[in-house]
Design a protein with these regions (language model features):
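Soluble ligand-binding/transfer domains with enclosed cavities or grooves
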Residues: 18-275, 279
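Cationic, amphipathic, low-complexity segments that mediate targeting or membrane/lipid association
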Residues: 2-9, 13
Length: 282
């Protein structure tokens, strides 16, 4: 057997040991999300996820968004109508926006990030975090693929980001609005398919007094907003909450440009910062 399949199998065994058994078709349906049937992820999961909903993958809609409407997040403590129009347009018409990105790693986290990116992310073409500014110097291309159910309604969207210089996949995520058990309103749910599993993040939406928009995956209990690893092994599925915490702050600067500050933390320590400049491409 080749080394890389052994490594991936060992990883699933690790998450089985660290996690708890779940029933994604029943009690833990909030953790049901797309997986990859092969080691290299790319966009291979899209058709299978559409089939789960009895629908299709829509690659033709102009101005497709990660969410059909930001109103899906409305509930106690959040009103989409209070969000700045540019922010709302980005989420509802993501494919009509161009993205420039800059990244910076904390010195303590860089070696681990380099190992993960080189030996995992780049190999499977998923979660291949940029390690150096030159990695994204020529920019990233993005594509939004809408997943529709049998009635034609958008139930999720794939946001696929590739390096313009090489065409290699950096991120391949499934975006939707999803309500956690007992929650009064929906969170933004992002699932990154992996072979026989996925990484999922539930982000709590917040609107600030200036109309800027914040998404946070804080520490907490199992079943609350945060990050989870799900892995299938031996005919069962396991899930573990992981100490990865993110925040996204989308705001309009004093020149009218939409920007995002993205902070990735492990436990409470900042591991990586990214900054995005978002401009209409249409």
């Amino acid at each position: 057997m080749a080394v890389t399949p052994l490594v991936d199998l060992s990883t699933r065994k690790l998450w089985r040991a660290l996690g708890r058994p779940i029933d994604p078709a029943g009690e833990h349906a909030w953790l049901r999300a797309p997986t990859s049937t092969s080691a290299v992820v790319r966009d291979g999961w899209l058709a299978a996820e559409a089939a789960v909903h009895g629908g299709t993958v829509d690659e033709t809609t102009s101005g497709a968004g990660l969410l059909a409407s930001l109103d899906l997040l409305d509930g106690p403590g959040f009103r989409a109508r209070d969000v700045a129009p540019q922010v709302r347009d980005f989420y509802e018409h993501t494919s009509a926006w161009g993205v420039e990105v800059w990244s910076g790693w904390s010195p303590w986290a860089w070696p681990g990030g380099e190992l993960i990116s080189r030996f995992f992310g780049k190999r499977v073409e998923q979660l291949a975090l940029p390690m150096r500014p030159l990695d994204v110097a020529q920019g990233m291309d993005s594509r939004v693929s809408v997943i529709r159910d049998a009635a034609g309604r958008q139930v999720a969207a794939g946001w696929l980001r590739t390096l313009r210089a090489t065409g290699d996949y950096v991120f391949s995520g499934c975006y939707s609005a999803r309500r956690l058990p007992g929650a009064a309103r929906a969170s933004v749910h992002v699932a990154f398919p992996l072979e026989s599993g996925n990484l999922q993040v539930f982000l709590r939406p917040e609107v600030l007094p200036d109309g800027s928009f914040r998404l946070v995956s804080p520490p907490g209990r199992f079943g609350a907003d945060g990050a989870y690893v799900v892995a299938a092994d031996g005919g069962r599925t396991y899930a573990a909450r992981v100490p990865v915490h993110e925040s996204f702050h989308l705001y309009v600067d004093d020149r009218g440009v939409l920007r995002t500050d993205h902070v990735l933390r492990l436990w409470g320590a900042t591991a990586m910062r990214l900054h995005y400049k978002l401009e209409p491409a249409r």
